């Protein structure tokens, strides 16, 4: 065998010895032991070692049904054979290149087939990059700086996107960015009209997610979305629809529902089939901002933009998420929400749409209740998001769904009883 292809033992790393028994806790070579602030669940966060289909296994050997799905990304579960094969083939043919490659073009064709109102797409490596890039297009096209967001709606980790969060999220964001970011309450039409009037001629973009999770997983009202569209038309503002999460809910996403067509869409997560991806989609007019043949085009690169592995895996993921798959997920979601509403107890409210659902305490410290629920569901073999959001994958069997609902309902009742005993919320 070619010496370069021989398997060699990996060098033992200095830090390995410092892993806690069975690797159960985070590693001290990572700040806080973790790689993302969204992983934080308290001091003793379990570590995952493997995923297959709708399941993951942790370092203690626990098996869980994964409704976290890497924060809604893995709409077909882990290691779907067709997606794995596509990624393997793409890797074998060269994982990334310094020139255009066909997988990017094929992915764009498949994506735009689902979005007939749009002409072109520019890829990046995350939803955060996609939102930041869409904002830059809006600023370049309008010659203005300000952008309107919904309070607490999450749009990633760019400075502008973090400005929508609370004090903690805004730490480290420059005063200049905070000043250009107008953050308004969800569905407050009067506030939107006032902000546009007050900052007339200075607003480049309104950024909307039709079902913003961190803002409470409550839908943007149709009249709000339509008014935003009207204001954009009247005042020359670019409407950006963030579909990084919601694209899983309908074949062409939900940003354009009710006759509201955003000028730009931002995508990510599922469209990479579990590999890093982000995308800005738009009409030819705005997307011309990226065209390097045009004078004054935007500078936009990215070493891994449109890399063949994400593109090929993502194309298969998109193909598999056809209307039939989405309809089945809608049915599973409706069943889960109905059962949880009936069985989780009066202390909880169940919200969501399609394959997304989330539990909220009717009173008390929501984040604390939801984190407790994360642990209580974990103990019963179900992995939620730390905000108690669940994303159902297409590979979930009907039996698995019922098991998940049993576990979450029982966990919810346990948390409510404990919190009531501690005097937090209505219990
Ligand atoms: C609505 C929305 N937009 C943007 C992002 C950022 O995507 P990424 O984490 O890929 O940067 C997220 C991430 O969860 C999101 O939920």
Task: Give the positions of each predicted feature.
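Conserved N-terminal phosphate-binding loop of PLP-dependent enzymes in the Aspartate aminotransferase
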Residues: 3-427
């Amino acid at each position: 065998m070619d010496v370069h292809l021989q398997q060699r033992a990996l060098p033992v790393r200095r830090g390995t010895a410092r892993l806690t028994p069975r690797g159960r806790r985070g590693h001290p070579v990572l700040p806080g032991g973790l790689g993302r602030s969204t992983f934080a669940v308290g001091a003793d966060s379990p570590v995952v070692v493997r995923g297959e289909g709708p399941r993951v296994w942790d370092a203690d050997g626990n098996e869980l049904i994964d409704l976290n799905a890497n924060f809604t990304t893995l709409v077909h579960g882990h290691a779907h054979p067709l997606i794995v094969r596509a990624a393997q083939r793409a890797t074998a043919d060269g994982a990334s290149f310094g020139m255009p490659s066909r997988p990017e073009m094929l992915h764009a064709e498949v994506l735009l087939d689902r979005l007939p109102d749009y002409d072109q797409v520019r890829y990046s490596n995350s939803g955060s990059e996609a939102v930041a890039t869409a904002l830059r297009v809006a600023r370049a096209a309008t010659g203005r700086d300000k952008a309107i967001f919904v309070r607490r709606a999450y749009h990633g980790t760019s400075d502008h996107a973090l400005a929508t969060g609370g004090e903690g999220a805004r730490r480290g964001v420059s005063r200049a960015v905070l000043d250009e970011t107008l953050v308004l309450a969800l569905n407050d039409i009067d506030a939107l009209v006032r902000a546009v009037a007050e900052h007339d001629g200075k607003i480049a973009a309104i950024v909307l997610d039709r079902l913003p999770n961190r803002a409470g997983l409550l839908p943007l009202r149709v009249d709000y979305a339509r008014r935003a569209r009207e204001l954009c038309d009247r005042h020359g503002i670019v409407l950006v629809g963030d579909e990084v999460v919601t694209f899983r809910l309908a074949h062409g996403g939900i940003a354009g529902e009710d006759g509201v067509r955003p000028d730009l869409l931002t995508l990510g997560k599922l469209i990479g089939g579990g590999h890093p991806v982000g995308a800005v989609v738009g009409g030819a007019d705005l997307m011309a901002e990226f065209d390097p043949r045009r004078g004054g085009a935007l500078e936009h690169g990215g070493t891994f933009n449109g890399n063949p592995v994400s593109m090929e895996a993502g194309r298969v993921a998109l193909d598999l998420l056809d209307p039939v798959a989405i309809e089945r997920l809608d049915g599973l979601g409706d069943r889960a929400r109905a059962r949880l509403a009936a069985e989780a107890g009066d202390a909880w409210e169940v919200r969501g749409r399609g394959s997304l659902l989330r539990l909220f305490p009717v009173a008390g410290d929501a984040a604390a209740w939801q984190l407790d629920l994360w642990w209580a569901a974990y103990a019963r073999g179900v992995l939620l998001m730390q905000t108690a959001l669940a994303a159902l994958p297409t590979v979930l069997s009907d039996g698995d769904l019922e098991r998940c609902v049993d576990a979450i309902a029982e966990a919810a009742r346990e948390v409510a009883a404990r919190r009531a005993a501690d005097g937090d919320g209505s219990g």
